[in-house]
Amino acid sequence: MTGVQTCALPIYVEECEKVVKIMAECGLERGKDFKVWLMAEIPSNIILADQFNKYVDGYSIGSNDLTMLVLGCDRDNDTVSHIYDERNLAVRRAVRHLIEVAHSEGKTVSICGQAPSVYPEFCEFLIKSGIDSMSVNPDTVKFTKKLAAQIEQRIMMDALTGKGRQEVEDLNW
């Protein structure tokens, strides 16, 4: 997205509508060179994605906060931190739902957080779900790019040969 300015909003639908309107009044209108994205970090952002689609061009999933809020646990609290896991079915269903709803109207979806670089199976889940981009820590970029390329190559080979892993888990919303 070189040369494209973006503005990320972590808010409710009504607030999003107001902010986009105020931005337009100030000369910041959505277009080819200015994109408005929503930080999808709270469950309501996912649940109401169909309504947010009217006001945004894309979503950036904040996987750390989204996981914490979907699972109702604090990853920094030793008493419950063992529950915190981006690979949890509820988190994956939320992520896939957002990708599907966003893509149904031509919106872009990115994810930021450690999970794609820490858990290869989560990286694979994201790719199979259609994620548009992943943002990871600088020290894991090379590893994650290589991992993603290997996963994409395997998916293509599986499609060509009719072999490979079959998804059995229900990820539908």
Predicted regions and their residues:
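Short, small-residue-biased leader/transition segments that mark boundaries at the very start
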Residues: M1-L9
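Conserved, mostly hydrophobic/aromatic
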Residues: Q5, E41, D65, L126
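Hydrophobic faces of well-ordered beta-strands that scaffold small-molecule active sites
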Residues: A8, V36-A40, Y59-G62, V109-G113, ...
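Active-site-adjacent beta->alpha loops and helix N-cap segments on the catalytic face
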Residues: P10-I22, A90-A94, K142-K145
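Catalytic cores of alpha/beta
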Residues: E15, S44-Y55, A115-I131
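Generic long, charged, amphipathic alpha-helical segments
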Residues: M23-C26, R30-W37, L71-A115
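C-terminal helical cap(s) of enzyme catalytic domains, especially alpha/beta-barrels
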Residues: L71-H82, I127, V141-R165
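Extended, intrinsically disordered, low-complexity segments
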Residues: E86-G106, A148-W173
